[in-house]
């Protein structure tokens, strides 16, 4: 084995000057014949796991990794808190940019629950922080807020992944 190899990755990686951090690397049995809660792993912000689809066929599913969802919520909360003083259109433009970016990266098939959770959390956070813009009186009630959201174009969650088309020749 070449030097720097951990024994868990192909030895050909050294040909490309790639190194693997042994403390971050592990071998995992990831098979549809051995599904369990322990057989999940996170990679590039997604959690990969096996689940049976409607036809009963085991498929690899992806969802937003819980740590990444928490981090995204934390970043969005800080942005909302720091920019709550902006005029409505400017605030919505910045909020929509952040929401769309999240949807475009994490908008894969099977992940709509996490997208909607992020959207609902963002709405609640906007309501909380836009109501704290000075003065003792609240800016608006929840009913007024939801009515206003229907009138403005706030980015809604959606699946952005394009399904692969099977072409038979």
Task: Describe these PLM feature segments.
Residues 1-169:
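Non-catalytic terminal/accessory segments
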């Amino acid at each position: 084995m070449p030097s720097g190899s951990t024994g868990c990755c192909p030895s050909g990686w050294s040909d490309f000057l790639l190194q693997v951090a042994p403390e971050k690397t592990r071998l995992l049995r990831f098979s549809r014949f051995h599904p369990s809660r322990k057989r999940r792993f996170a990679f590039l912000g997604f959690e990969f796991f096996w689940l049976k689809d409607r036809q009963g066929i085991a498929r690899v599913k992806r969802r937003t990794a819980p740590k990444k969802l928490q981090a995204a919520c934390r970043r969005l909360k800080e942005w909302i808190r720091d920019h709550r003083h902006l005029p409505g259109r400017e605030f919505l433009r910045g909020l929509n940019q952040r929401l769309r970016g999240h949807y475009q990266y994490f908008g894969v098939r099977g992940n709509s629950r996490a997208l909607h959770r992020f959207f609902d959390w963002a709405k609640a956070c906007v309501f909380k922080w836009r109501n704290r813009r000075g003065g003792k009186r609240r800016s608006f009630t929840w009913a007024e807020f939801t009515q206003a959201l229907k009138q403005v174009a706030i980015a809604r969650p959606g699946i952005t992944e394009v399904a692969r088309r099977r072409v038979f020749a």
